């Protein structure tokens, strides 16, 4: 019997999210790799949930980070209420989109935690 790849497919340019230990990685879908049930994404931001409210705290701008190919099953659709505040933070006129060493390390740690 042949295993069928996952049927999870996201639309190109759609914003998706991976949730892990109260941290959220938001990314833009570049393409679906259906043969291996993976998703090619462009990281946008890393955020953390606030236990006292439903709001997310913006942590790192990841727009200049390396693109990722990860299992599609890790992702979920990002909610408008999550994305809109982050987008306004990312594209604020006074904000530079420089990938800092701390942001790069945070992304690396987040991805490493997924595979532990």
Regions found by a protein language model. Give the residues of each.
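Short beta-strand-centered aromatic/proline hotspots
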Residues: 23-34
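Membrane-targeting and insertion segments and their boundary/processing signals
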Residues: 1-4, 77
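Short, solvent-exposed secondary-structure boundary/capping segments
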Residues: 36-44
